Amino acid sequence: MVPGIVVAVRAGCDTPKAITDMTAGQRERRAALTDAVIAMLHEMEPDRIQMREVSDRSRVALGTLYRYFPTKLHLLAASMVAWNDRLSRKLEAERSRAREAGVVDDRSVRDRVQALYRRQLRAFQRGPNFARLDLELAASSDPYVRESMQCRAEANHAATLALMDGVPDDVARVALLAIDGTMLAALAQWTSGRLSYAGAVRNVEDVAALVLADYA
């Protein structure tokens, strides 16, 4: 995961305005909206979130909310990216402190990658509604949602690839496909009660161990 994701959007009145086209005040109001949604997702499932309540909590007028996000799905997608950014900034801050302290990560590629995915799974364990939202957004055909999720995926992949020193590009690509696919399936089974959290972690770790066996 990497901080500072900029969500690109298509031009048009039925899609959210690009962050890069916003004034400082507009970016602040947009952040207030996504912050409110993130807080609400810790309390309720995505389908229970109402735009009016988001407006009330964020103290952003309902009309302004709809100018920024024409649909609830767009708002949820932007909030998912914002939540991911929070995790990314925290991770990068920890890595920065370790570098400044001269700490050397002597773990194998496999162990580093497994640790990163365990960390992501713990974030979903603390906020299972984010896992539910992730699955909903992954199934969406909306162009803005798909583009937002692609930005998020690319950022997360960049963070994972940074841990794969010495791994050939073709091997790394297949590893990401395999681990991400297992992660998505594990989240679907876990949130539906068909798999325990421990089972979800084990599935992801096992696949990571298999595809990165030569880098243990």
What does each model-identified segment do?
Residues 121-158, 189-191:
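Short secondary-structure transition hinges
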Residues 1-28, 39, 95-99, 216:
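N-terminal intrinsically disordered/low-complexity leader segments
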Residues 92-126, 201:
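Hydrophobic alpha-helical connector segments
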Residues 32, 111-119, 133, 174-182, ...:
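Amphipathic alpha-helical interaction segments
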Residues 88-92, 141-177, 202-205, 209:
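Amphipathic alpha-helical packing segments from all-alpha helical-bundle domains
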Residues 4-8, 170-192, 200-211:
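Hydrophobic alpha-helical segments that form the core
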